[in-house]
Amino acid sequence: MMTHTSAAPDQGKISFGGTNNGLVAKTIKFSGTASHAGGAPHLGVNALNAAMIAMSAIHAQRETYRDQDTIRIHPIITRGGVAVSSVPADVRMETYVRGASIDAFLSASEKVDRALRAGAMAVGGSVEITTLPGYLPIQSSQPMLEIYSRNAATLVGSDGLNRLGHRTGSTDMGDISQMIPVIHPYVEAATGNGHGIDYMVKDYTLGVLTGAKAMAMTVIDLLHENAATGQMVVDKYKAPLTKTDYLSLLRGMMKEESYTE
């Protein structure tokens, strides 16, 4: 059980339930040939152009993604070159590839890899792609949610509760949920945009004290009478993966690929 702050006070004070996207993470290196950008650009191979073409190719794939898969791909360039007067020969990019299911984000990941290779091919350069497992989609334990929601209602009232749908961010709690029962509620104690510079916890009592009380009350209910309720939660949970399955899945997501035109 983990509680996260959020910034949607119009939806209530405590939000819970719902699902999240999973993801893989990629680091990419485009390699070209340096040359004088003004005097002899024709002797260079522009790795920044390869990255730009790759990003355009990634965007061109967006119409192929199903709405229900909620694919999110958001690359950034972390190194664009070393000097304005030199054709960029070493350009670095990072991106996450997110989706509502494992199959969805792995399929999108393959499309991203094609786009990255296409960028390198177009300019006659090369690309190295490293893919790492990120987070898996989350699923919540319904019995735990029922216990938590009753406790949360005593703190903020029934009108202060909000049942979530699907959220397109990702969380490491998703990995845990593939093997054991979890819940991941939110306290709507912040303002601003999530992960933005303006994000700030405005309601400390709600964000820290009330959130902690709701979890503590739920823990007491789960452990009461020799953890009978906790055992019921465990017994009813249908885990998608065993530990062995989980490790095998993550290891299968890890790969390094090099492509040279």
Language-model features and meaning:
Residues 1-88:
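Histidine/acidic-residue-rich, glycine-tolerant segments that coordinate divalent metal ions
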Residues 52-261:
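Metal-dependent amide/peptide-bond hydrolase catalytic core
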